[in-house]
A protein has these predicted regions:
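Glycine-rich phosphate-binding loops of nucleotide-dependent enzymes
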Residues: 2-260
Length: 260
């Protein structure tokens, strides 16, 4: 079941530096939300707060009604959160299939520890998850690469491996951190088609941090724009791109005045 997400007055301070200030917004189940803003706006820091890599200084973060501020990533994974990173975190010496299978360990009886100890009751579940992983790779057109070392594949395919690994955990909430970074135009179009298919086939909520506004326009139901750690506006991608405050944040007040 797709998750809801609610942030209320989230603040993040590192010493005297205010990275996030009073950020609040809600994401309904099944929505694709884009989190956008200029460099240094606080987008990845906010992702890190949601995914348990940073503990906010104050405020509330709830997933489907459960307070999760400051929770460990392992607890968030059990609640159905999965995340990709701007720079894929893969085991390059492992095969593509082995990398994808890492996403399924959270679903094993007893979790990753039982899998590592090779306890008997994990065998059936492990075989089922392996079959799912192979099906995901076939569906993505990557079945041919399942037994290849990950380091033999391109950056674009590394991005795909990380996405399929996240999906194998059966997430209710999926966070995609700059999924189009470093991709060619053709790879971006393929990514858009993939995310649309994921949405059509799975009951899932997706939040995307991205600078590629073509992708944001093609995929999102709504966007939240951050600037200097604050929420600047919320609305549709089209509304954001025509909002004078957003234009000023991206290109500067003088340039925005000249454009007007």
């Amino acid at each position: 079941m797709a998750a809801s997400l609610s942030l209320k007055d989230v603040n993040l301070h590192f010493g005297g530096v205010k990275v996030l200030q009073d950020v609040s917004f809600d994401v309904e189940p099944g929505v694709i939300l884009g989190l956008v803003g200029p460099n240094g706006a606080g987008k990845t820091s906010l992702f890190n707060c949601i995914s348990g890599h940073y503990k906010p200084s104050s405020g509330s973060i709830t997933i489907t009604g459960k307070e999760v501020r400051g929770s460990a990533p392992s607890r968030l994974a059990r609640l159905g959160l999965a995340r990709t990173f701007q720079h894929p975190a893969l085991q390059l010496n492992a095969t593509v299939l082995q990398n994808v299978l890492l996403g399924g360990h959270i679903r094993l009886p007893g979790g990753p520890v039982s899998w590592a100890l090779r306890l008997p009751y994990t065998g059936r579940a492990e075989r089922a998850i392996r079959a799912e992983a192979l099906e995901l790779l076939d569906h993505a057109g990557l079945g041919w690469a399942a037994e290849l070392p990950a380091d033999e594949l391109s950056h674009g395919l590394h991005k795909g491996i990380e996405l399929w690994r996240a999906l194998l955990s059966k997430p209710a909430l999926l966070l995609l951190d700059e999924p189009a970074a470093g991709l060619s135009h053709g790879e971006v179009q393929q990514l858009i088609a993939t995310v649309k298919r994921i949405r059509a086939e799975q009951d899932i909520t997706i939040i995307i941090v991205e600078h590629h506004m073509g992708l944001i326009s093609a995929l999102t139901d709504q966007v939240v724009v951050l600037d200097h750690g604050r929420k600047l506006m919320a609305g549709t991608a089209a509304e954001a791109q025509s909002d004078p405050r957003v234009i000023e944040a991206y290109i500067g007040k003088d340039s925005a005045d000249d454009a007007a």
